[in-house]
UniProtKB/Swiss-Prot annotation:
PROSITE patterns: TRANSALDOLASE_1, TRANSALDOLASE_2
GO biological process: carbohydrate metabolic process; pentose-phosphate shunt
Protein's name according to its UniProt entry: Probable transaldolase
Stated role: Transaldolase is important for the balance of metabolites in the pentose-phosphate pathway.
Keywords: Cytoplasm, Pentose shunt, Schiff base, Transferase
Pathway: Carbohydrate degradation; pentose phosphate pathway; D-glyceraldehyde 3-phosphate and beta-D-fructose 6-phosphate from D-ribose 5-phosphate and D-xylulose 5-phosphate (non-oxidative stage): step 2/3
UniProt GO MF annotations: aldehyde-lyase activity; transaldolase activity
Keyword Metal-binding: no
Catalytic activity: D-sedoheptulose 7-phosphate + D-glyceraldehyde 3-phosphate = D-erythrose 4-phosphate + beta-D-fructose 6-phosphate
EC number: 2.2.1.2
């Protein structure tokens, strides 16, 4: 399974990249705003910097809601760097845009997917990736990972090449469940990536080894 990081923070991206586990980045308007980016020029520069850092897929979102405007915006985003993947919302206009962009060879990530039928429509329209939001479904007492399982079954039935990005990941259990189901990708906040690497027994083991080694060193003196 591939790991993307869900952030626009350069320090977080650099740190995750240094671990040797990073396969891509996803951003959204909220994450961009969190970095204090206030104009189009700075946004373009920021996305280009991320692409140069990791040389891997970087999702940048089109904020238009009309299909024609989405297409124009997507072309502009795709021109930033060959690694840019354009995030398109799962709407009727979004599907129209995805179809056209697919024909032009522009990679797309259909976001805000909450049902298997939405995922099916996005795949048929030619989406490169689809992003089911598991955490938001869990928030309303639905089963986010069940959605992923249903999408995987449908895509397997019809051999769709569209990859599934498990999004809205809130904790390590979401990542574990995604991996067990066979999802292509999980896009993970930096905090959760950090949690994946830790276990209290590992920490205790390291501490014990160090204490035992100190005893050996003292005996040698």
């Amino acid at each position: 399974m591939k790991f993307f990081i869900d952030t626009a923070n350069l320090d977080e991206i650099k740190e995750a990249h240094s671990l040797g586990i990073l396969d891509g980045v996803t951003t959204n308007p909220s994450l961009i705003a969190k970095e204090g980016i206030a104009n189009r020029e700075d946004f373009i520069r920021h996305i280009k910097t991320i692409c140069e850092l990791i040389q891997a897929p970087v999702s940048a979102e089109a904020v238009s809601t009309d299909a024609e405007k989405m297409i124009v915006e997507a072309r502009s985003l795709a021109a930033i760097d060959p690694h840019v993947v354009v995030k398109i919302p799962m709407t009727i206009d979004g599907l129209k845009a995805v179809r056209q962009l697919s024909e032009e060879g522009i990679k797309t990530n259909v976001t805000l997917v909450f049902s298997p039928l939405q995922a099916l429509m996005a795949a048929k329209a030619g989406a490169t990736y689809i992003s089911p939001f598991v955490g938001r479904l869990d928030d309303i007492s639905a089963d986010g990972m069940n959605l992923v399982e249903e999408i995987l079954e449908i895509f397997s039935n019809y051999l769709f090449e569209t990859e599934i990005i498990v999004a809205s990941v809130r904790n390590p259990l979401h990542v574990l469940a995604a991996a067990k189901l066979g999802a292509d990708i999980a896009t993970i906040p930096f905090k959760v990536i950090d949690q994946l690497a830790h276990h209290p027994l590992t920490d205790l083991g390291v501490e014990r080894f160090l204490k035992d080694w100190e005893k050996v060193e003292k005996q040698r003196v």
